[in-house]
Each structure stands twice: as C-alpha cells, then as structure tokens.
Amino acid sequence: MEKACKEPEEQPQSPPKADEERPSVEPSPEKSSPEEQSSEEVSSEEEFFPDELLPELLPEMLESEERPPQERLSRKDLFEARPPMEQPPCGVGKHKLEEGSFKERLARSRPQFRGDIHGRNLSNEEMIKVAEEMEEMKRVRNKLMVMHWKARRNRPYPI
C-alpha cells in the first residue's frame, strides 16, 4: 500500500522534466508563425483574467490589436495599467450590505433613507408622503429589531 501511494507522487515530477527538454526541441519564437504565438498567449491570458473583468477591458484590447505588433500591448499589460476598481462588478464578491452582523447591516442601511429627501425638489405633499414612508420603514425596522432581539434572548443555548 505504501509503495502504491509513493508511485503517484513520483509521476507528477516526471512531466516537468519533459517540459524542460521541450523548449530546446521547439524552434525559437522568432521562427514560429504569429498564429501559433497568439494561440499560446490566448491560453495563458484566459487563465490570467477572470471572465467578469473582460467586458471592461474589451475596448482597450481592441485598440491594442489594431496597432502594429511592435506597439501592441499584451492583455496583461493592459490589465495592470488600469486603476483598481472601487467596487467589484456585479456577481463578484459579496454585496456590501450582506457583510457583518445584523446591527452593522442595519446601521449601514440607514443613510440611504436619511438622504432620500434632501437631494430632491419636492412639493409639500410629496415631502409629507416621503416622510410618512420613511417613518413606516423606521417602524418596520424597529419591529424587526425587537423580534430579532427576542428570538436571540429566548433561545435555550447561545448562538
């Protein structure tokens, strides 16, 4: 059994040796056709870029492909030259309100409602309507907080 376990460990070490020998057998990159180079670059670039980020880089990649080969930038260089994103694209990572405890999420949601009225030009009737909606949201929020507090307090064992 021990010999059988050791054999698979030794096998993955042998392919890198074959890879080390391969570059000497292949022709130099200058002699190989540009189509072969592009297919090799594409495979390595697909591994480098997550699928979610590609739509943002598409216009810059198309511009770079139109240039002559000497001036053309690789996709990795384009990606590194861009400033980091402030927020991840949709579907990547958690939504900012999903992180943290219940009270932290509740505290983060409040500024959204607080600033809702101030940036608008509303008539008195509209302002009263929006204020009533906000009060109703506050009541519902407080009710949920009390229910959450009671549920946590009445458990036989702490969470």
UniProtKB/Swiss-Prot annotation:
CC per GO annotation: nucleus
A matching Pfam family: BEX
Keyword Cell membrane: no
Chain intervals with Basic and acidic residues compositional bias: 17-34, 64-80, 95-119
Swiss-Prot/TrEMBL keywords: Nucleus, Transcription, Transcription regulation
Start-end of Acidic residues biased regions: 37-54
Cellular localisation: Nucleus
Region (Disordered) location: 1-120
Function: May be involved in transcriptional regulation. Modulates various viral and cellular promoters in a promoter context-dependent manner. Does not bind DNA directly.
Record-stated family: Belongs to the TFS-II family. TFA subfamily.
Record-given protein name: Transcription elongation factor A protein-like 1
